[in-house]
From Swiss-Prot:
GO-annotated molecular function: double-stranded DNA binding; nucleosomal DNA binding; structural constituent of chromatin
Modified residues (N-acetylserine): 2
Keywords, comma-separated and alphabetical: Acetylation, Chromosome, DNA-binding, Nucleus
Main localization (coarse): nucleus
Ranges of compositional bias, category Basic residues: 152-183
Ranges annotated as biased composition (Low complexity): 7-19
A Pfam family hit: Linker_histone
Protein source organism: Caenorhabditis elegans
Keyword Acetylation: yes
Organismal lineage: Eukaryota, Metazoa, Ecdysozoa, Nematoda, Chromadorea
InterPro entries, per database record: H1/H5, Histone_H1/H5_H15, WH-like_DNA-bd_sf, WH_DNA-bd_sf
Protein's gene: hil-2
Listed name of the protein: Histone H1.2
Matching PROSITE patterns: H15
Amino acid sequence: MSDVTVAETPAVKTPTKAPKAPKSKTTKEPKAKVAAAHPPFINMVTAAISSLKERKGSSKIAILKYITANYKVGDQLTKINSRLRAALNKGVASKALVQSVGNGASGRFRVAEKAAATKKPVAKKPVAKKAATGEKKAKKTTVAKKTGDKVKKAKSPKKIAKPAAKKVAKSPAKKAAPKKAPAKKAAAPKA
């Protein structure tokens, strides 16, 4: 065994990976969101339902036909259909739409108008109260000339409030004028 000489194999150099040049980090600019060629689906649905004016409400198929005919939503009907279903379900959940017949996205849908009609009178009442309370504070100042007309209507039953509302800024001048007028009339017959 000692006679056998082992031929030395040249050491194979493992190819050392050249240090990669660090890639210059190019900050990819976020793609600007391209504005859609159509409004949100819930707006398109409400527009479709209101323009179709069907007595029992509009079906999903009729709404889909209206949207594809009037808006640029693309050619992929499966995507449009799924977004339409989602918009209908969301509209029913948020009470913007009323489902008159059916379950889920099937059936007939109408725009909920009763909720909008009941909200408007409620909003008007607090505004009138605020104007009335603001007028009480503003009697001493000359700022509330424009709101005087509105307050006159609200406080017409009270006799004390009427003169105060009419004579917001000119009350001293008007009071002085009636006092002088009787004096002149009294003086005129004597002379």
